[in-house]
C-alpha cells in the first residue's frame, strides 16, 4: 500500500509562504526512525532530508503569501498540501495528514492530531518540509 504522509510549515509566519511536503516511505519504512521536525536538530534534519530524497517518493507544495491573503492561512495550508500530493510521481492509496483538518476534495485522506509524532510518513514529511523551507 502506498501511504503518503503530509505536513506543512509556515502557518505561524504570515509574511512567508506555506510549504507542504508529501512523502511516501515505501520500502524505506522501518530502516530509519523519523521524529517531528520540531524535535530534531538542523543537522539531523539535513541528513534525513537527503535520505528521503535518495530513497523515497516526495514532493513539495507551496502556497504563496498572495494565496494566504486571497484565502486564509488554513485554506492556503490546504492548497499547499493538495499541490504537494498532486505533484507526487505516484498515486497514493491513503493520505495521512498532520492536524485536525482534511483539505476538501481529498479522497482516502485522514487527519491525525500529533501525526508528526505518531506516524512515520508524517514525521518524514515534517522533516522534509522544514528543511526545504529553512534552506
Describe each model-derived feature in a short phrase.
Residues 1-135:
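RNase H-like, Mg2+-dependent phosphodiesterase core
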Amino acid at each position: 500500500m502506498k501511504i503518503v504522509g503530509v505536513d506543512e510549515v509556515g502557518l505561524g509566519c504570515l509574511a512567508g509562504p506555506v510549504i507542504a511536503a508529501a512523502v511516501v516511505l515505501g520500502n524505506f519504512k522501518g530502516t530509519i526512525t523519523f521524529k517531528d521536525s520540531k524535535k530534531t536538530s538542523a543537522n539531523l534534519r539535513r541528513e534525513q532530508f537527503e535520505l528521503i530524497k535518495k530513497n523515497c517518493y516526495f514532493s513539495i507544495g507551496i502556497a504563496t503569501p498572495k494565496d494566504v491573503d486571497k484565502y486564509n492561512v488554513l485554506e492556503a495550508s490546504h492548497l499547499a498540501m493538495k499541490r504537494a500530493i498532486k505533484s507526487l510521481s505516484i498515486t497514493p492509496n491513503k493520505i495521512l495528514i498532520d492536524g485536525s483538518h482534511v483539505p476538501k476534495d481529498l479522497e482516502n485522506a485522514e487527519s491525525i492530531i500529533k501525526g508528526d509524532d505518531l506516524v512515520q510518513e508524517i514525521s518524514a514529511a515534517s522533516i522534509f518540509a522544514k528543511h526545504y523551507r529553512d534552506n
